[in-house]
Amino acid sequence: MLDQAVAYLCCPHCRGNLLLDGRSLRCRAGHSFDVARQGYASLLGGDARTGTADTAAMVAAREAFLGRGHYARIRAAVADACAAVGPDPRGCVLDVGAGTGYHLAEALDRLPEMKGVALDVTRHALRRAARAHPRMAAVGGDAWRMLPLRDGVVSVALNVFAPRDGDELARVLAPGGALVLVTPTGRHLAEAIAALDLLTVDDRKRERLEGKLGGRFDHAGERSI
């Protein structure tokens, strides 16, 4: 699927356009990125925070959890929001922090004319995302750094329980594009938090989120699940 998505990608070192040359992505400046045999390409820059990447066991556990339908309502709501934006085949659907491509695959089913890019820092997740949907490309990238996508090529950006850089999301979104953002409430994973004495969701999370995204995006609506 990388052959269909390369038109949206750029070099993480020089921001030059990329071309698919056999089993590599290359820019005119000579930077080259191998395509793994599993079908994904890593476009992580030199300053990427790979130390935060999930292990193979963590990815397998998450895939099993999602496969049991625990997030099915969230997945459907994300797909509904994408469908409401409407298809724009000139741009792609980007999922920042896509993991295995669980949410993006459903969104692409609802937008049959569009292609998707699953961006994640974890190679174990990218291996699964590369085969999650025939119109999904899996690309290694750090949500906290420059996104390896060209300016204004994203029609819909997804960000589901994942980190984000508001400036970068605004840069890659096309005029009239939409950001579909999913954040936890205080009830998120409440049973696990209580049983394992984990950190709770910050009461000021919404305020901090609006502070980071304010001025770049107009609020179009929200839904609680």
List PLM regions with ranges.
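Class I SAM-dependent methyltransferase Rossmann-like catalytic core
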Residues: 51-77
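Class I SAM-dependent methyltransferase SAM/SAH-binding core
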Residues: 92-95, 100-146
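A short acidic, Gly/Pro-enriched loop at the edge of an enzyme's catalytic core
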Residues: 145-156
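A short SAM/SAH-binding and catalytic strip from SAM-dependent methyltransferases
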Residues: 154-168, 183
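Substrate-binding/catalytic lobe of Class I Rossmann-like enzymes that use SAM or dcSAM, i.e.
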Residues: 194-225
